[in-house]
């Protein structure tokens, strides 16, 4: 099946999305195609009306190598019989270099195979694509060498359809140095930090990178129109302030100060020079905190003084996050122009549940304006040590005057959590109430306009001394999600990490809930 769409309407539609969401950065051609406000609202409402969402949604994320290691039919048998899975988020584009290896820190569960020791995966596309979708970008050669000759879409999707399952392309775009080095031209689209150094993260304002991202969406929905039932897009990136605080999702550099970002800043009336000066001052403060060199007025007071004297710090942080919103809305518009009935949604990084700074700028309500569903990473077992580490980072930067134990009561109050002490959540994880809280928050913030799919923690990797998943944990988290009003769940993080007893607990629980 081949899908054709009107290019003029496509450009017009991107203008509709841009104007409705109040996002900047589109070209003058797109801006000129904007329609009256009443038409824009009706058009966006139509997207949601036309989108076909599966009832009793149970999804799972599956890496490309799984299909080769376990066999496609056997893996699908396991997913259906044990997990009650009806939708697979199959990685079609991935960055992750790691596999479970013999003698490694993460044990192989009771299925699958060990990966080769000492060999990092390169990442890239695990499907074949027509170059015509990438005519407007220099990033054309990105087929992964990891599983040569294996096209996950043509190999897996037909077998899933025969079982009445849905195949969702999982387009995962995290920053990864090996991909930056292996994909021709990727270094040219990299972010530039405040000191003028290129990093390992692509810039959302670089037109080549944006055309690359858009080309993949066109390829999934046009070239593979009969195979792909929906798309989930993800990129676990943060703006400069959250990156400076640090933690598990931090990327290299205080960014971005490339030519495209500085030009965009000037159109907003932001002084590039003062923004740089402010971030350099903030960097010096956090470096002093790392050395326990407390200024006479204290770390928090000097932090406030720095952002008051250099409000461009906050303006630049918003510029980065607005650009992130802008790209995602553009991808949504592309998808809806081609296949309005197919769901297009986003993976939401778990930091939105930890960081008040990240949650303030990448909130559920804003992302819901340009999506059909949100998959929220609310992994409660892994969330314990992750939250504990984040509070440690706060007390190593902005709140370096305090200890984590000092900050914990205030932090819990601000974030609305009722959890155990940091020491106890590190070893015992977070309770199912955390899943309930985040599910309800997402539903409330989005006004029920989009489907909410909480990610259920099933053996998300943990370190020695941290909480490990049990079947009872899975049952409790699954029940918490649905009792809070979730439209479905995504068994997380990866199928190849899950022990079958825990996967079965999810299947048993959803069968009971669905009746």
Label each region the model flagged:
Residues 1-18:
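N-terminal secretory signal peptides and thylakoid transit peptides that target proteins
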Residues 3, 24-55:
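C-terminal segment of N-terminal export signals and the immediately downstream linker at the start
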Residues 55-56, 142-143, 168-223, 252-265, ...:
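Active-site-adjacent "subsite" loops/lids of carbohydrate-active enzymes
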Residues 74-97, 121, 226-228, 484-488:
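Catalytic domains of carbohydrate-active enzymes, especially glycoside hydrolases
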Residues 85-146:
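Aromatic-lined carbohydrate-binding/catalytic grooves of carbohydrate-active enzymes
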Residues 100-120, 175-197, 234-303, 387-405:
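Aromatic- and acidic-residue-enriched segments that line the glycan-binding/catalytic groove
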Residues 168-176, 232-236, 275-282, 321-356, ...:
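Aromatic-lined carbohydrate-recognition surfaces of secreted/lumenal glycan-active proteins
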Residues 371-385, 428-441, 445-507:
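Substrate-binding cleft of secreted/luminal carbohydrate-active enzymes
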